[in-house]
């Protein structure tokens, strides 16, 4: 509670010192840096088969938190799967990093994902993260790890969407949790608070886990005029529009291209912009000697190209491809992955459909998920993944620099 009081004091002083025009109607915004799926595990000794950047994931967590501070974030929001297996040692390693972020002046809020309750119970989880949301909650749900927190005139409604049945991928929201959720929304409406809701599992996108209570939760948010729901779980940025609710699946800050979400809470809405972590700048100011960290963009691009080439090779198997066809397939698949990761896929979807490597990938991927996934990803691309503003339930795309085809 002390750090929120400090934040409010700083905000009050800033308002007192602000120009007269600010006193005539402008509202100081609250800036939130959000990420999901950090999967912290100090014992990682992998070659990065699932995520090529896994060997550097602890450094990338540090770089992300440092970058968030450089972007003047007030709040660091972690949307679940903050550890890899829910082991106490993993939680303790993350908590040490969160304390460092807090010491830099950022308030920290966490919620659990499907990987976070393992060796620790739900009660132990809340105790471990008492300084990062649970000990400062305005209200806590008695049936889950859901809670709310009030920051200024913004209510953070943080949902625990995980089911604790012993099966990692089970998810649900109980009737009791939904009643608690509606109570928080009703209170916010009565008090005139703006609501930002978040959870680990998506509620709107069709590309995620179906679970009990999902549709009812989304409808509650629509009914109470909530404009934005943040989540993770998919490890890839995704924007899905409801009737008046926008869902943003935030980036995984430890995987290519190492971005996170910057959310500005404004007077009647939100502004979202993806932010690339300046890993090389972080490494240089820390005096790191590792050349991969010091030229990180080039390093992670090489790894992503190699990963995409590996996918092509596995799909090809014993099938006959000329050297030119293989190069075209690799070029297509890397561009598809790269544009999707950077949020520019809708801009280049038409070009990629005409790319000679597109038909080759679908052909060699026949009978696999890729033959369905590639057309689906190209058709589902939306322009809002480069950033957007929300005002009164209306979404507008932020202008973004043109990527290189």
Indicate where each model-derived feature is located:
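N-terminal active-site segment of His-dependent metallophosphoesterases
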Residues: 23-91
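Non-catalytic terminal accessory segments
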Residues: 23-27, 284-405
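Active-site-proximal beta-strand elements of phosphoester/diester hydrolases
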Residues: 29-45, 153-164, 196-198, 245-251, ...
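Acidic/histidine-rich helix-loop elements
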Residues: 36-61, 85-86, 119, 123-140, ...
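Active-site environment of divalent metal-dependent phosphoester hydrolases
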Residues: 41-44, 84-87, 112-121, 164-167, ...
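His/acidic metal-ligating clusters that form di-metal
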Residues: 68-75, 155-157, 168-248, 322
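Extended active-site neighborhood of metal-dependent phosphoesterases/phosphodiesterases
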Residues: 88, 92-179, 242, 246, ...
